[in-house]
Amino acid sequence: KPIPIIVADLEMWEKCAYVNETAKKLIEKFLPGPLTIALKKKDVIPDSVSVKSIAARIPSHPVALLLVKEAGVPITATSANISDRPPLYSVQKAFVTFKKNVNLILDAGRLPRRRPSTVVDLTMDASPKIIREGPVSAESILKELKMWKDEVK
C-alpha cells in the first residue's frame, strides 16, 4: 500500500511529483486542506514509499504544516490508526494503540473529528478519478475543474 506524504507548498510538491495543470488548479482551490492528490512520482521518492505514483497533500493542521515546513522535505503522513480500523483522535488513544511500535508521539491537541481526506487520482492526464470521497466532495472538484476548463477555452 503506497504511503502518502505531506508537503509544505507547491514548490516542494513539484520536487517529488509531476504536477500537471489540473493538479495545480485543485491545489490552488482546495489546499491546504483535506484533499490528497495522486500524481506520477519523480525518482527522488523511493520505491519503498511508492512505485509509480505518490499521493500528497498540504495539511491544514498548523502543527503538521509547521513540521513539514521546518523539515524542508516531504514527510510521510499516514492516518493515526491501524489499517481498516477507525481513526484515532486523541494522543491517549494513540499511545495505547502504538506504544510498542513508535518512538515518539507528538501531542498537538485533540484532532478534529472528520472523515479521512478526499483522494483524487491524477496520474492519468485525461481526467480525475475520485478514489475516496471525504470532506471535499467529488461534485465540488468536478465543478471547479469544469469552470477552469471553460475559462481556458
Each model region followed by its residue ranges:
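Active-site-adjacent structural elements in enzyme catalytic cores
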Residues: K1-K153
